[in-house]
Amino acid sequence: LLLTAMAVAGSLGAQTAKPVRVPDTYKPSNNPMYHKGWIDFNKNGKKDVYEDPTAPIADRVEDLLSQMTVEEKTCQMVTLYGYGRVLKDDLPNESWKSALWKDGIGAIDEHLNGFRQWGLPPSDNPNVWPASRHAWAINEVQRFFIEGTRLGIPSDITNEGIRGVEAYRATNFPTGLGLGHTWDRDLIRRVGY
């Protein structure tokens, strides 16, 4: 009953999204950094150890760390909150090349998920929905980090994981502690599907 009430309440506040053109399916660029079997992440024209998928992981990590500046290492320990929070732009643009994340960023959380604030309607940004357009936009963000930063380290794109996903048209469930208090294994199993 609680889950039904939550689903109905969530749909009452939802707005109908405007139709938008979905960009063509993400296709890798013709950037010369892409080779058969490996990617030249640092764009130096040779396969470094960290770029070699057949090299032992410990060697790859050591090689990458040896090439990183203090600024790049620091940025890999940072989570940047996405569009409408810290990020003012939904997609990479020229200003990103001089922003803090020009050296990469460890993670971007809740980027383009449509959530603005409890009690407010979802963001009307066209890159939130439909899901195919959202995927395209997230791929464009990753393209910036891979193709536009010195070492090409992808960012970890994350979203609220405690209650499912904090995103437009997604179902939010109570926290694990709240679900556990139901003592209803069948209900918990259905939440997981």
What positions do the PLM features span?
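Bacterial N-terminal signal peptides
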Residues: L1-S11
